[in-house]
Regions:
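Short, charge-patterned binding micro-sites
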Residues: 3, 41-62, 91
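Short glycine-/aliphatic-rich beta-strand segments at the starts of folded cytosolic domains
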Residues: 4-13, 18
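C-terminal binding/interaction regions
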Residues: 21
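Amphipathic alpha-helical assembly/interaction segments
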Residues: 17, 26-27, 31-33, 37-44, ...
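Beta-strand elements of well-folded, non-transmembrane domains
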Residues: 10-14, 34, 58-60
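Glycine-rich, flexible loop/turn motifs
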Residues: 14, 39, 88
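A generic structural signal for short beta-strands and their flanking turns/coil linkers
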Residues: 2-6, 34-36, 50-52, 84-86
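C-terminal structural segments of small proteins and small subunits
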Residues: 58-93
Length: 93
């Protein structure tokens, strides 16, 4: 078994309040959990309304599946989130 861990740091300059940010984060996290069956949550910068940091983790049978899943998640976030990705980290444990 492998654990795939990803972190996305994104910039959303049009967001003007924490309430607006919270709606964006909740929607993205729910979509990720539903589509990919992963654990996802906002893990940092909760008090900064223009920066979104999402952590994602999943347990997969082998390394190749972890790579494939992380590629799919990355493409999904690029296509479904208006925020620009500043940084993406990946780790397989």
């Amino acid at each position: 078994m492998q654990i795939a861990v990803m972190t996305f740091r994104m910039h959303a300059p049009w967001v003007h309040s924490l309430k607006e940010k919270r709606m964006i984060v909740k929607s993205l996290v729910a979509k990720l959990q539903s589509k990919f069956h992963v654990s996802a949550a906002e893990i940092d910068e909760q008090d900064t309304h223009t920066i979104i940091v999402i952590g994602i983790a999943a347990i997969v049978p082998h390394h190749a599946m972890a790579d494939s899943l992380m590629d799919e998640i990355s493409v999904f976030i690029e296509k479904n989130c208006e925020a620009g990705i500043l940084e993406e980290t990946r780790e397989i444990r």
